[in-house]
Amino acid sequence: MKFASKLFNKLKYLTMIVLVTTVVSCDSWLDLGSEDRIMENTLFSSQAGFMTALNGVYIELLNSSLYGGTLSYKTFDILAQYYDCDKDEQTWQKLSTFDQTAKKGQVSGLWSKVYTLLVNVNTIIEACDERKEVLNSEYYHVIKGEALALRGLLHFEVFRVFGPIYSVDPETECMPYSESSDLKVRPLLKASDVARLMMDDFKAAEELLKDYDPVIKKGALWGDEGPGLPNDMVYRSLRLNYYAVKAYIARLALYTGDKATALTYARQVIKETQEDNNWFPFVTRAAATTLSKWDRVYKTEILFGLYNLKRSDVYESTFSNKLGEKVILRPTDANIESLYEEDTRVNDWRYTEQWMTLKDPDGNEKKHFVKYMAVDDTEGPDDNKVSQGYTYLMPVMRISEMYLIVAECSNDEAEAFDHLNRLRAARGVAKANQALGLSRRAKR
C-alpha cells in the first residue's frame, strides 16, 4: 500500500528528527498492545484500521506525561503547592520549590509526548482525505472531527504551559503548530497565531461533527444505551465528541479574552445537554453520597474523559494511606479545609466523599484523597456497579466548567448568580449571597 509505505517511512526516521527538535521520547506508531494491532500495510485500508489508529491516540493520552499524571493530578498541582512536600526527603520536594532541574525534567516530558503524538494525529487527518473511499460518510466526519479536536487539544495543553500570559503579551513567540505529519522543523509562532490555529481546528471539528455525532441525538451512550450503533459510536464521553469540542471552544475563548464567544458556547453546551436534553446531567445526591463508594468522579457530568484500566494504581502509588511520607501526595488537613467554604463544607459532597480520614503507616489519622480509590464491583445495586465505569474514568472536561464560564463572562448578574448557584446546588452547597455581586462588578 502506497500510503502505508509512506507513513511508515516517515516514522522510521522519527527518532532522529525529533532529537533535533528536542522531542526526545519517540514511541512506535501509537504503541498499541498486541490485541489492538493490525498489520502496518493495512492500517488505513478499513474503517476498523482508522478506529485502531484513533483509539491508539486516546490510549496515549493516558501517558504519565499527559493525563495519566502531569496534566491531571501531579506536576502542576505540586508546583502549585497543593500538597505538603516540605520535608527534604520528600520525593517531590524539589519540584514543589521550583527547582529548575526537577521542573525541566517533568515539564519537558509533556512537550516531547505532545509533539510525538501530533505526528500520529496528523497522519490520521491526512489519511481521512487520502483514503476517503474507505470510510462511509459518518465515519469520515466523526474520525476526522475527533482527530482535528485532538490536534487542537494537544496544542492547547502545551500552550497553557509554555505560552505567555495571553492578556499581557499575545505576540510572544512560544511554540510551533504541527499541521502535517512530515517531520520538518517548524518555527515558533506568536501566541496569537497559535490561538487562532487552535480555534480553527476546534471550529473545523465542530462543523464535521455537528450532523454526524450520535451524542447530539442520543447522549453519552454508556453501556446498553446505543442499540443498533456500532461499538465505535457509543461511549461518546470517552471521545472528543461534539459537545466536548464546543466546551473546548468556550475554554479557549475565555483563555484568550474573548468572553463573548466563551459565553455563547458555554450557554449552548448547557442548553443542549441539560436543558433541552438530559445528556450530561449533574450527579445526583444519591450517587454522590448514599452510594459514596461508587461514583466519586461524577460520571454523568463528564463531557470528555479517558478510560484507564489502571486508574486504581493512581491511588495506590500516589494517595494511599499505606504510603509513607516520602512518596505520598497529601495536603495538610488545614489546606484541605481551606479549599472549601467553612460554613458549607460539611454539606459539600466533594469534601465529604472525596476525602477520607484514614490511618497512615504510623497510625496517625489524616485525611486522604480517595477520588481514585478502587471501586469494589461485588457489592451494591446493579445499576451502580463498576460496569458503569466509575472505577476507570479519568475526567478531562466537565459540564460544570460551562457554568463557571457563564458566571464569569455574563454581564447579567442574575444570570451569573443563577448559574453559579445551580452548580453549588449540584455539590450540596447553599446558594451564594448575590449581594457579593456588588464587589464582583466593582472589580470589572
Where are the regions a protein language model picked out?
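Bacterial Sec-dependent N-terminal signal peptides
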Residues: 1-35
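Membrane-proximal, proline-rich intrinsically disordered regions
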Residues: 26-75, 99, 308, 431-432
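Conserved, well-structured interaction surfaces
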Residues: 51, 90-162, 184-193, 202, ...
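Short, surface-exposed recognition loops and adjoining beta-strand edges that mediate ligand/DNA contacts
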Residues: 70-83, 164-171, 215-317
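Elongated scaffold/linker segments in the mid-to-C-terminal portions of large proteins
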Residues: 268-419, 425-426
